[in-house]
Structures are given as structure tokens and as C-alpha cells.
């Protein structure tokens, strides 16, 4: 028996079947950086239309988690796809480097500033610590295959960025949005500092729920307001009843608030057993629930009054020797409580607003550490949360406590310490939302932005409509200074603040933020002014640092120095987690509108949080944390990247070992498809072997047309950031259009046709065109694998797939083409029907394999007309040794019905000899002298001109 193996076109490639990504990716990464891939991309795209995705800076503390990986990979995929679409799309990664978490880490090692270490030394230690954290995170991001300006990222602690943050403050002040005020702000007693809205998270907390009596100072004046019948004005002490869950704020109480339009009832509590007679004022709607919880069963109503009638009546503070007024406020409701609100202007935003209206004292008896100040009567030196019990004791002693019980409710907590926070009035700097129309302008600008998903617009609108002034000052050491001078007596800003800010910014540019604390005011403004003005020693909220990066980074770095007419906004796209509507998206919008009068971004795209396979948050205690490093070490970054791109990331994104295993399986299918292409391009030189499109075999033309259609859909999905649609289309193309049909059909031709003949070269031309497109579709997502494929592809090419653009060599089938998509769809349906009967015949041992079969198709006239177009090449499409087509009228009894109407098929085992080269059973095997074991087709392919293929 002769060995015909050497006469076959066997697949051959250096592209391995197994990716072995965990080991091979680091080698590829090294080459990318050794050969300056990012620099090559920048050179290739210079002068192209710009696309700016501005990186929201992660905090420079700790290892990256799976949420960071999701975020950075999404950004990288978008940047790479934009690059392939012909944009100059630089990526400058950033880090948020100031603020409390870094201070706390340094405090652990070095002690608090001003104690064991000077403030200047402390700042230097913070800078070093942050720099180390940036380096660690940077290496982790690079390992994920994320390309960018890693050698020159932006860090909010870079001297130039710090200087620009200070300039931003100057611009906002110059536009009239800066405000100094003594206001209640979210205050963390552990941080010892104010918190921004975005630094507050809500958790359930158990608090004491108390109803407290404030006795009327002038009983007759109070009774006169109620419609009580003469002589029936009741008996016992007369009080209003307030409800609160923060007893510790009662020392700061300066009023009781009612709603002007609510009806209030004067209730007579009857003497009964131990219950003394007393009279209580409550909102009519809530009276029964208040009395029920106080276990008061015997009572009746004496009279009614409108809230507006009770304004300015005086009531005694429950434990201090002064009276407080009844005031009116829109914030009073009957949702819960008593309909009368305890008002402490120093401890609540609504209390503060209504307190200003009535010119109430903004009492603040609480220090920055949450402890009552030394002059706080009854409670000095106690921590507020521990003082709740003391307050209750005093209320009981004074007979002012009507009722109390434990109450679980949602309460603001510090996002860092996870501890309850307080509202505390302190002198702070604010960006005013209303004094110069900032809120209205910001809401207007929201409408000009494309929000993806669309619900993001309503979300941020609601937040901006309801948000308080932005408190931008912090009482911390490691932060950008609020570089302002205020008059020692009037507290007014220096009239030349803008010029002074520029002088300070220049110093900071040279020496960093320490320059502010070192510089003598006289150096900047002369001795005379310096005697009257003092430096502000507060630092800026870190959300201000990151919020103004549209100016401090995007408007300032040379990478973004694009023509002005291209840039309607500082950035085209911001892409972060959905929690950033209340964080970075909002701080960026407010600061940009305050500085420039417009939004900083054209589009805002959000992704959901990462959860486990059961939809639970990642938690070390549950043990469901998936660390990026573990995934890259075990499966490789491309699997992680494919997981990211396969998910509808606008919702919660699930990850688990099982989900990653599914990504690995999908990856293998794509890799095997690419390997088939490469292996079958062995010996193909595109410079000399390309077959002109019009001369290609019909099926090859169809395959290129399918790639053309897939490419259009894939580019559209990339443009719309619908990455899961990209992966779905890619999988469908590889598994269904190619794997289940085209690649299956062409194996015979590819392996057995004459080496270098038209039949093989037509097929290779199609494979070449398709792999040129496929490698580019993959590149943004499976970057390492695309690079590997690129280096195995035939022909002259650029060094990297990432510097090019989408492949332009594909073509669609011509209008009116005979062998069009519809034709091949019908043929695939015929093939699928025949395959089912071949499987059944194999199961019944009628045949061993499909090539042992001869099939007869009995079809209606319309189907025959289509099938017969393939002439004697139908058998190659069906993968059988023979295929005959006959009209339905000639159908035999042995022919079986198929799923297709009008098609019956008869399957018989071929009695012809098997060709030892192509394995087809054909009558002419052994009929040609010198080739006793092979068929005539194979002899032609070995020694002759080669078979002719027109259709398949």
C-alpha cells in the first residue's frame, strides 16, 4: 500500500492548540514594552481624528480587585477599538493620591502629624506611600494587557496637577461659586473631618426612638390658639411632643417645627392609675399612633388648631433653662413621628435652613472628635453616641420622656470607617449650588450629555436637584490646600485672590503642596497686607482633586493637545461604575460647569458592580472573592478580558470559577477556529497566490461575504460599546457560520486539491481575507491571542495588529448574485436534514461514516432547481461519496422524510472501493495504472492539472 500522506496539503502552523496564556502572556507583554507598542500606536495615529476617554482615577491604596479589572479592561477594549476605527485615542491612566486612607496608613507607621512627626515630614511620607501604591497597581493593570501612558500617568499628587487643582479653585471662585459658611456638614468623628456627599453610605443602625415633651412657657397663650369650648380647657401640664432618633442632638435644640397647613390636636390625657392628667399637642393624623406607643388608653380631644396658628409660641427646653419657639417648616411631614420636629440648626441641613429663616442660634456643642465640648451643661466630655443613654436619663428625671423604644433605620455611615457619622455645624468652604445659578446650569448641561444606560440621566438629575452645597474643605494634612487668604477681622477673601492663587500655583508647580505651608504671606502680597490677612489651612476634598481633572489633566497634558474644533468637551467619554453618579461624574460635572459653563464629557457610560455567581457582593468573610491576579496566574488575562466583553456590563456583572470556565471554553473555540485558518494557510503567499474575487469558488465568496457582514455588525457594536454583542457575533461566526459549515465543507478540498492549484488557492484566499479581519475583531478583547495570531499570519505586515485599522479587503456578495446568502442558507438547511439521516444510518450500522454513504435526495421542483445548481459538487457539501437528486414523484419506499417540506432522503452504503487518499468511495478507484489505490480525482490532483471546483 502506497503512502499518499506527502501528496496531501496537511495543515501546518506554529500556532499551538493550547493557549498556555498564564505562561506566555508575560513574554508577549515584555515584547510590547521592549518594542514600545504604545509609542508605535501613537505614532501611527498622529493627526487622526481624536477620541478622549478620560480615566477616573482609582485610589492609590491596596491591591486591585476584580471591579478595578472590569473597569480598566472595558476602557482598554474601547480605546483599542477606537484606534482600529482610525481615531487617535490616547489613554492616560490616573491615580487619586491625597486623602484620609493614605494618611491613616502613614499614621500607623509614623504617628500623627504634629506629634511624633512634623506636618511637612508627614506629607512627604504620604507622598512616598502613595507612589509605592501606584507602582503596585500599575503592574497589575499592565498584566491585564491594558495599554496606556504607563511611564507618565497622571497622579493628583504630581506637582503640576496639584498646581492646576489650585488654579481650578481660583476659576470657580472667580465665577462667583465659592462660599464660606458655618453650616452643618456630614462629619466623621473617626476622620475628624467633614465628608462629601459621595463619602457617605447608608447602613442599618439601631437608635433610640423617643417622644419628648416640651412644656408650654405660656399656657394661656397656647390654649388661646385652640378651639376649645369655654370651661373645657383640660388639666395637667401642657406640652408639644417631638420625636427624634438622635437624643444626643437635644442639647443643641433651639426650636420645635410644625407644618403651617397641618391640623394639630390638643389631647387631654386622663388621670388613670399611675397615669397623671396632662395635655399634649400632636398632629391630628399621628395622635393615635403616638398615644398607642406610649400605652395611653384614656384620653379625649380638647380642640384643634392649624400649624400656622401656633407659630412663635414659646416652649421650655426639656432640660435647659431657656425657651424655644414653635416655627414653621415645609420639611415637617406626617410620615412618622408626632408631626412636630425637634430642630437643632447645628446638626441638620433642614434644621439649618429653617433656623436661618428664624435667625436661630446655630449651636454646636460637639467637638471634631464627637465629644461634647467642656462647657456643655450635663454632658461635657461624653461621646455623642454614648451620651444617648445619659440624655434619656436626664429626660426621665425631668419628666420629659413620653416614650422610648429601640428603632432600626437607615443611617449615614463613613465609607472608610463604616461607622455612624453626625451632622455638625462648622466653618467650611462650599461650592454654592445656587448663589450664581450653578444648579440650574448643571441640570441644563446634563441634557446635552449622552447617558448610557439612559436611566443614568434621571439618576444624576435627581441627585443634582436634591444635593446640598458641596462642602469642599477638609481639616486634614495630606491634601491640596485651599490656597486662599482671608481678612483676619472680616473673614473676606483678599481682593487679589486670583493673582495670589496663580502665584501659589507657580510655587506648587515647582515644589509641591508643601510650598503653601512654607511660604510667608508677605512674599506674595507685601508686609502691609500680610499683617491683615491669614492663610486658610484647610485642604480640598479629594473629590475636588479628581473632579477637576478635566482641567488639571485633560486640558493641560500634551497628549490631549488636539485641534480646538474637534473638542466640543474636554473628554468624549467617562466610563465608571454606576456609583459614580453621586461621585466622580457629579464632581466633574459641577466643577466643569462652574469653571467653563459646560459639561466635561460628551458621553457617560456606566458599568454595574461585580457579584458572585449567586448575585452576592464579593466578601472575604463569605469567601467568594475572585482576585484578578489569581485568574491571570491560572487562566491568563485574555480569559478575564473575554469574560468582561461577554457580559452585559450595564447591569451587575457575575463572576465565579464556573463562569470563568465558560469563558475559557468560548476562548478555546475561537482559538481553534483561528488555528484552523493559520494551519491551512501554510504555503500561501498573499503577494503571489491571491485568487481574484470574481474567480473564486462560490462557497469561498460566500464565506468572505459572511465575514463582511459580521465585520459591519461587530464595528457597529464596538462603536455603541455593546461589547457582549461583539463576542456573541464573533462566537456565532466562528462556531456556526465557519465551524459548523464552511470549515467542515472545505476540509476535503483544502487537504486533497492540487497543491497550489485554483481549488486550493481560492479557499486559501478566503481563509486569508477572513483571518485578516478576524484577528482585528479579536484584538481589542483577546489582545494577547490576536498578537500571537498576527505573528503567525502569512504576508508582509506591520509589527503589531494594534497600529492598523479594520481590514478593508473583505467584499460583500454582488447584487443579484446567483449563489447568494439565501441560496447558501437553503443549502445549509438541506445539509442539516441530510446529516440527521446520516447520523441515524450510522447509529443503525448501515454506514460507518458519512463518506461511506451514497444519498439520493427526492425533492420538489423548487428545491431541485436550487440543489442542482451545485451540479456534481453537491456531494462535497453533504460530505458524502455520492449525491443524486431526483423528483419527488420517483421517491422510493426506503426514502425517509426530513424536517424540510418537500425533501425525502435515501441513505445507502456505497459498494464502491475506498480511495486511500481522499477516503471517498468512488467507482474509478484503481482504474488508472500506477495508482491502484486512489480515485481519478486524486490522480489529477497529484499528477495532473488538478480538479476543477466552481461551487464548493
From Swiss-Prot:
Record: residues binding ATP: 620
InterPro entries referenced in this protein's UniProt entry, alphabetically: aa-tRNA-synth_I_CS, aa-tRNA-synth_Ia, Anticodon_Ile_BEm, Ile-tRNA-ligase, Ile-tRNA-ligase_type1, Ile-tRNA_ligase, M/V/L/I-tRNA-synth_anticd-bd, Rossmann-like_a/b/a_fold
EC number of the protein: 6.1.1.5
Recorded superkingdom: Bacteria
Positions contributing to L-isoleucyl-5'-AMP binding: 576
Motif ('HIGH' region): 58-68
Annotated keywords: Aminoacyl-tRNA synthetase, ATP-binding, Cytoplasm, Ligase, Metal-binding, Nucleotide-binding, Protein biosynthesis, Zinc
Cofactor binding note from Swiss-Prot or TrEMBL: Binds 1 zinc ion per subunit.
Subcellular location, principal: cytoplasm
Residues binding Zn(2+), per UniProt: 915, 918, 935, 938
PROSITE patterns associated with the record: AA_TRNA_LIGASE_I
SUPFAM superfamilies from the UniProt entry: Anticodon-binding domain of a subclass of class I aminoacyl-tRNA synthetases (SSF47323), Nucleotidylyl transferase (SSF52374), ValRS/IleRS/LeuRS editing domain (SSF50677)
Catalytic activity of the protein: tRNA(Ile) + L-isoleucine + ATP = L-isoleucyl-tRNA(Ile) + AMP + diphosphate
HAMAP family cross-referenced by the UniProt entry: Ile_tRNA_synth_type1
Protein name, UniProt field: Isoleucine--tRNA ligase
Organism: Aliivibrio fischeri (strain MJ11) (Vibrio fischeri)
Amino acid at each position: 500500500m502506497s503512502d499518499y500522506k506527502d501528496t496531501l496539503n496537511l495543515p501546518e502552523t506554529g500556532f499551538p492548540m493550547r493557549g498556555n496564556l498564564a505562561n506566555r502572556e508575560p513574554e508577549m507583554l515584555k515584547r510590547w514594552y521592549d518594542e514600545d507598542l504604545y509609542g508605535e500606536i501613537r505614532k501611527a495615529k498622529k493627526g487622526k481624528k481624536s477620541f478622549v476617554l478620560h480615566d477616573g482615577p482609582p485610589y492609590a491604596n491596596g491591591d486591585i480587585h476584580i471591579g478595578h479589572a472590569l473597569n480598566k479592561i472595558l476602557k482598554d477594549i474601547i480605546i483599542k477599538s477606537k484606534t482600529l476605527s482610525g481615531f487617535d485615542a490616547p489613554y492616560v491612566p490616573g491615580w487619586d493620591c491625597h486623602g484620609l486612607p493614605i494618611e491613616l496608613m502613614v499614621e500607623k507607621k509614623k504617628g500623627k502629624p504634629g506629634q511624633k512627626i512634623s506636618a511637612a515630614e508627614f506629607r512627604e511620607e504620604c507622598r512616598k506611600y502613595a507612589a509605592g501604591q501606584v507602582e503596585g497597581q500599575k503592574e497589575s493593570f499592565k498584566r491585564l494587557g491594558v495599554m496606556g501612558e504607563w511611564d507618565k500617568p497622571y497622579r493628583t499628587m504630581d506637582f503640576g496637577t496639584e498646581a492646576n487643582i489650585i488654579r481650578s479653585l481660583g476659576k470657580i471662585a472667580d465665577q462667583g461659586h465659592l462660599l464660606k459658611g458655618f453650616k452643618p456638614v456630614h462629619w466623621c468623628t473617626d476622620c475628624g473631618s467633614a465628608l462629601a456627599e459621595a463619602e457617605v453610605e447608608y447602613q442599618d443602625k439601631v437608635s433610640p426612638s423617643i417622644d419628648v415633651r416640651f412644656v408650654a412657657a405660656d399656657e394661656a397663650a397656647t390654649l388661646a390658639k385652640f378651639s376649645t369650648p369655654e370651661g373645657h380647657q383640660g388639666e395637667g401640664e401642657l406640652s408639644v411632643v417631638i420625636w427624634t432618633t438622635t437624643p444626643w442632638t437635644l442639647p443643641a435644640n433651639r426650636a420645635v417645627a410644625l407644618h403651617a397647613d397641618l391640623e394639630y390636636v390638643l389631647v387631654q390625657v386622663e388621670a388613670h392609675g399611675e397615669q397623671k392628667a396632662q395635655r399634649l399637642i400632636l398632629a391630628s393624623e399621628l395622635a393615635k399612633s403616638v398615644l398607642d406607643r406610649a400605652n395611653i388608653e384614656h384620653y379625649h380631644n380638647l380642640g384643634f388648631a392649624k400649624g400656622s396658628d401656633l407659630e412663635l409660641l414659646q416652649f421650655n427646653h426639656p432640660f435647659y433653662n431657656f425657651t424655644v419657639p414653635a416655627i414653621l417648616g415645609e420639611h415637617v411631614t406626617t410620615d412618622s413621628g408626632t408631626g412636630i420636629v425637634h430642630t437643632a440648626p447645628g446638626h441638620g441641613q433642614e434644621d439649618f435652613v429653617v433656623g436661618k429663616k428664624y435667625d436661630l442660634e446655630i449651636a454646636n456643642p460637639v467637638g471634631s472628635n464627637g465629644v461634647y465640648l467642656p462647657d456643655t451643661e450635663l454632658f461635657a466630655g461624653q461621646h455623642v453616641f454614648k451620651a444617648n443613654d445619659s440624655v434619656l436619663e436626664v429626660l426621665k428625671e425631668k419628666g420629659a420622656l413620653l416614650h422610648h423604644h429601640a428603632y432600626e433605620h437607615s443611617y449615614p455611615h463613613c465609607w472608610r470607617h463604616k461607622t455612624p457619622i453626625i451632622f455638625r455645624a462648622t466653618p467650611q468652604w462650599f461650592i454654592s449650588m445656587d448663589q450664581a445659578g450653578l444648579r440650574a446650569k448643571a441640570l441644563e448641561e446634563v441634557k446635552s450629555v449622552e447617558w448610557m444606560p439612559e436611566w443614568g440621566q434621571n439618576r444624576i438629575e435627581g441627585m443634582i436637584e436634591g444635593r446640598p452645597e458641596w462642602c469642599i474643605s477638609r481639616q486634614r494634612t495630606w491634601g491640596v490646600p485651599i490656597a486662599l487668604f482671608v481678612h483676619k477681622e472680616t473673614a473676606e477673601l483678599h481682593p487679589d485672590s486670583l493673582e495670589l492663587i496663580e502665584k501659589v500655583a507657580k510655587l506648587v508647580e515647582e515644589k509641591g503642596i508643601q510650598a503653601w505651608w512654607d511660604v510667608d504671606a508677605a512674599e506674595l502680597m507685601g508686609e502691609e497686607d500680610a499683617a491683615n490677612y491669614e492663610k486658610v489651612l484647610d485642604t480640598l476634598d479629594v473629590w475636588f482633586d479628581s473632579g477637576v481633572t478635566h482641567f488639571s489633566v485633560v486640558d493641560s497634558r500634551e497628549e490631549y493637545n488636539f485641534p480646538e474644533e474637534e473638542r466640543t468637551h474636554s473628554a468624549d467619554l467617562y466610563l465608571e461604575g454606576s456609583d459614580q453618579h453621586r461621585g466622580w461624574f457629579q464632581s466633574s460635572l459641577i466643577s466643569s460647569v462652574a469653571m467653563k459653563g459646560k459639561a466635561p464629557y460628551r458621553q457617560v457610560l456606566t458599568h454595574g458592580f461585580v457579584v458572585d455567581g449567586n448575585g452576592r457582593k464579593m466578601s472575604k468573610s463569605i469567601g467568594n472573592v475572585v482576585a484578578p491576579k489569581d485568574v491571570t496566574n491560572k487562566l491568563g488575562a485574555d480569559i478575564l478580558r473575554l469574560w468582561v466583553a461577554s457580559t452585559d456590563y450595564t447591569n451587575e456583572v457575575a463572576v465565579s470559577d464556573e463562569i470563568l470556565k465558560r469563558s475559557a471554553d468560548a476562548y478555546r473555540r475561537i482559538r481553534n477556529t483561528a488555528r484552523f485558518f493559520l494551519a491551512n494557510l501554510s504555503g500561501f503567499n498573499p503577494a503571489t497566490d491571491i485568487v481574484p474575487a470574481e474567480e473564486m469558488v462560490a462557497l469561498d465568496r460566500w464565506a468572505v461575504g459572511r465575514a463582511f457582514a459580521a465585520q459591519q455588525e461587530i464595528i457597529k457594536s464596538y462603536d455603541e460599546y455593546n461589547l457582549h454583542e461583539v463576542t456573541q457575533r464573533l462566537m456565532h461566526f466562528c462556531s456556526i457560520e465557519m465551524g459548523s459549515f464552511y470549515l467542515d465543507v472545505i476540509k476535503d478540498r483544502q487537504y486533497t486539491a492540487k497543491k497550489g492549484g485554483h481549488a486550493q488557492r481560492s479557499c486559501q484566499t478566503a481563509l486569508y481575507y477572513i483571518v485578516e479581519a478576524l484577528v482585528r475583531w479579536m484584538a481589542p478583547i483577546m489582545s494577547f491571542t490576536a498578537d500571537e495570531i498576527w505573528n503567525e499570519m502569512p504576508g508582509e505586515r506591520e509589527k503589531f495588529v494594534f497600529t492598523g485599522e479594520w481590514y478593508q479587503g473583505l467584499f460583500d456578495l454582488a447584487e443579484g448574485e446567483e449563489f447568494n446568502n439565501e441560496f447558501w442558507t437553503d443549502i445549509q438547511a438541506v445539509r442539516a436534514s441530510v446529516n440527521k439521516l446520516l447520523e441515524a444510518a450510522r447509529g443503525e450500522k448501515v454506514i460507518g461514516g458519512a463518506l461511506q454513504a451514497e444519498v439520493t435526495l427526492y425533492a420538489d421542483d423548487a428545491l431541485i432547481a436550487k440543489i442542482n445548481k451545485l451540479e456534481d459538487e453537491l456531494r462535497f457539501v453533504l460530505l458524502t461519496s455520492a449525491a443524486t437528486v431526483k423528483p419527488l414523484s420517483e421517491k422510493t419506499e426506503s426514502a425517509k422524510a426530513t424536517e424540510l417540506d418537500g425533501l425525502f432522503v435515501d441513505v445507502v452504503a456505497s459498494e464502491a472501493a475506498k480511495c486511500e487518499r481522499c477516503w471517498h468511495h468512488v467507482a474509478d478507484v484503481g482504474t488508472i495504472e500506477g495508482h491502484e489505490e486512489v480515485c481519478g480525482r486524486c490522480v489529477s490532483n497529484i499528477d495532473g492539472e488538478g480538479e476543477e471546483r466552481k461551487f464548493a
